[in-house]
Amino acid sequence: MAKSIRYILKAFQEPFGGPLQIRRHVKALAESGFDARMVTDSLSDNHFYDLPVPTLLRSDFNPTQSDICVIPEGWRKEFEELGKSGATLICLCQNHFYVHLGFKRKETFATFGIDTVICCSRQVANHVERYYGVPDVQVIPCGIEMRPEVPRHKELAISFMPRKAPYQAGFIKDVFNRCYPELDGVEWIAIDAQSHSEAMRRLGRTALFLSLAHREGFGLPPIEAMSLRTLVVGFHGGGGLEYATSRNGYWLYEGELIQCAQELRSCLEMIRRGTREISDKLDQGQLTASYFDVSRMKTRLIEFWEGRV
């Protein structure tokens, strides 16, 4: 008897990359003929993602031995409750910085009967393999939508997402404004609690994206900016080591806030002059982003699930 795939989630008051990737998993699996659904406590955050997927409400979900429940890292309550149902449990780990939230001392995934862990990046997988005794972590890469056409006309403006690092955002902006009054006309465009489509529109219209990535398992915004030919300046947050190189952006250590303001100014000047260095970085960034096209994620996802249901 074929098993049902149930990705466990809950609604949040603001958008995150993790729930977006879960929706992409469910959509890809359902389109490929799998019995896959998202199980959530509410539909209240669906408007953030513009991505309808087959869904069950938690109140209507009665897990059995015929279900495979895919649970995010750190969700101890779900590990315990769903483990009692007889369902098979798999952990989808999208951020290694949160794994410890699901365990007491000396506990591991095996404590909850979990022997399979899916990770969104090699950075996350390395951590799980090394510290949690899972010998063969499965990596299913994050997927982004590569657009056939991207905005060629860019506003000389800086987009940024302050959610994880509002202090750093404010500090960098203050130093920039005080040191470079001649650039007072450069607009700073915050992307915060907007829908994914609106976030992509704002990213796409700006020449620069200030990456404030912090404690990331992968970090979607910088790679999405690259896909839109928006130049990335800032931090990779750890997980961004999956894609960040000196060829596709201007990357700094997280504490280098003043240097970040200086780099933004330098890049704006090069963009104004239309330098080859900038065009080369944009080309390389777009190429890097193409490696994470959602089709690659779907191929790996199907390979993983074909042998399990």
Protein language model regions, located:
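Short hydrophobic beta-strand element within catalytic cores of glycosyltransferases
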Residues: 231-234
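A charged, aromatic-enriched C-terminal amphipathic alpha-helix characteristic of glycosyltransferases
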Residues: 272-307
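Extended catalytic core of nucleotide-activated donor transferases of GT-like folds
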Residues: 43-114
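Aromatic "clamp/platform" in nucleotide-sugar-dependent glycosyltransferases that forms part
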Residues: 214
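Short alpha-helical segment that forms part of, or immediately flanks, the ligand-binding pocket
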Residues: 200, 223-227, 241-242
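Conserved catalytic-core segment of nucleotide-activated headgroup transferases in glycan assembly
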Residues: 18-21, 126-131, 136-199
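N-terminal pre-catalytic "stem/leader" segment of glycosyltransferase-like enzymes
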Residues: 1-68, 238-240, 249-253, 291-295
